[in-house]
Each structure stands twice: as structure tokens, then as C-alpha cells.
Amino acid sequence: MSKLQLRAVVADRRLDVEFSVSAGEVLAVLGPNGAGKSTALHVIAGLLRPDAGLVRLGDRVLTDTEAGVNVATHDRRVGLLLQDPLLFPHLSVAKNVAFGPQCRRGMFGSGRARTRASALRWLREVNAEQFADRKPRQLSGGQAQRVAIARALAAEPDVLLLDEPLTGLDVAAAAGIRSVLRSVVARSGCAVVLTTHDLLDVFTLADRVLVLESGTIAEIGPVADVLTAPRSRFGARIAGVNLVNGTIGPDGSLRTQSGAHWYGTPVQDLPTGHEAIAVFPPTAVAVYPEPPHGSPRNIVGLTVAEVDTRGPTVLVRGHDQPGGAPGLAACITVDAATELRVAPGSRVWFSVKAQEVALHPAPHQHASS
């Protein structure tokens, strides 16, 4: 199996990315709608030619805009799985799965028993052999997606692209597909790029996470690092942590555009004037109806934008911060929310102890190897 390398600029979609995925590795790509996730996959698959860039798979160059190279999609050894399984409605499940290998190896007209045996083997891999003689219209959404996975893997791709393949499936079907993907992808050894909005997909399937914002890479790294200490706006929102942007002042605090000071523990040396971010969980935030007194060094007043009950707790969030970062959030008990009479439009004060705040260098556009 081969390592995937991508460098692509697509001007009209504002995409400018560079990253790589090793054989046997799963890279999850997160980002808001319109960030460029699907565009990046389409460039890899050969469905979209970039304005500038390179797609390399091991020692094979699939796209090179400078050299004028653009290998056809069907010759790339790239499997693509979308939200819609896109099964051929007139073919049986077994014939759908056999289609990929037949195209790749020129097996059309070869022995019927041979092609069926190959299809059944891949259907067994995804626990769908019992559907071999059915037509796609006779399958549920989860069953059809299993067949689509088998068809993609049957062509023995070096790269598997999964574009939100679990969207639209019910909880049970999605759980089953995750289990199938986890096992068959590990055995296949191919490089995998997965786009998703679901953290469960990331936790169960991915080795690394890439966060796309406005067509560029905001951050990339191991799953645990990105989701426990995110350094991008979208990463913070999806991971459920607070993120504040600013620069380091002479006293070591983070100073925001509005003039607020945030004190915390730097994760590395942060010189004065360095762009940085403060990260802390909503559970570390205390909420008061008036400015509090005492030991906490970080106090900020805000107007409540939303209140969301989550079981025994209530998430209180302010309006988006200057610059577009998500509003600060606090996680408090139902009793505390009732006592505070917190509601959208309420004026409250958030208080956070300095030891609960981590100060990180601000993220910048970068690539991965």
C-alpha cells in the first residue's frame, strides 16, 4: 500500500491545502459546511482538476498541474464512498460488488463463478453476504451502505475516501457501519480520508484529525491532541471547549481585542506580543449575577445568547466573540440555572480560575507529513 500526498489550490472554491496520509492511517477531516472537505476529496479522486497542485500515491503521480498530468478517475486506484451508496439499481448486490474489480482488471467476460466468488468474499467482510441476490431497492439504508463499502474495497484501492458515509443513517445502522469500517479498513491497509461532522466517527475510526476553515488547514494532529486542546474555532466548538484569541502581554496574560486579560498556564514559552489562544472547558466556568469577588483572576461579563439543558446540566453560552470565535460557554447545574434565572438576554459574569486555563500558541496554516 502507498502513502497519499495532496497539495491543491482551487481558487473558485477558496481551497488551499497540503497534507499526507500514510498507508493504513485514517485521517478525519472536520470543518463547517463550505470549508472545502468534499472539494479536497474530489481532487484526490480525479473528479475535479485543481488550479495548481499535486496528487501523489506512493511513486505514482495522479495529478501534477505543472507537468500536465491528470490520471483518469478509474485508473487512480482510489475508492470513493458518499452519503448516497449509488448502487446500480438494475444489478444484483453481488454484481454491484463485482463491478469494481471487473473494471480494474478487465475481467468482463471472465468466468461467472470467479467473479461471484470474489464478490461474495467482500460481502462476507461487511456482513452482507445474505443480500447477494437482492436488488438495491430491497435493501435498507444501512444494508445498502454495507454493499457500497464492499464494492469500494473489492477494487482493492490504495486510498479510500469516505465523504460523510454515515449521514442519514439511524443510530443502530450507523453503529453497525462504523464497526464494519473499523475492521475492514484495518485489514485493507489502505490510506483513508474521512469527512464527517460526528465526533463518534472520529473517536472510533480516526488516527489523526484535520480541521478545515474557509478552505485552509486550521489545525492537524492526533485525535486526542486536537479534541482535548483544540486551537481552531471549529475544533473548539465541536470539542465543546472555550477558546479566546489574543496576544501575550508583558505580564504573561492573553490580551484580547476588547482589552480583556486572560491569565492561565502556558503550554510552552510564549513571548510578549506572540499571538496565542486561551482554552478551557465550560465545566471550569462559574456563573454569577454580579461581578464576583475572590481568588479567580479571569472574570468577564456577557449577555446570554442561548441556554441548552443537557440532562442534569445546563449549557449557558454568550454571543459570538469579536472576530467570529464561538461565544463563551459555561456548564452549570439545573439548580444553579434556576437560581440565577438565566435566559437569553440575561446579563451574567463568567469566572474562571487561572489554573483551569491553558495558553497555546495561535494556530497558523500548515501542512502535514
Swiss-Prot record:
Residue span(s) of domain Mop: 293-361
One GO MF term attached to the UniProt entry: ABC-type molybdate transporter activity
Specify the protein name. Answer: Molybdenum import ATP-binding protein ModC
Tell me the residue numbers annotated for binding ATP: 31-38
Gene transcribed to yield this protein: modC
Family named by the database record:
Belongs to the ABC transporter superfamily. Molybdate importer (TC 3.A.1.8) family.
Q: Pfam family of this protein, just one?
A: ABC_tran
Q: Where in the cell is it found?
A: Cell membrane
Q: List each copy of the ABC transporter domain by range.
A: 4-239
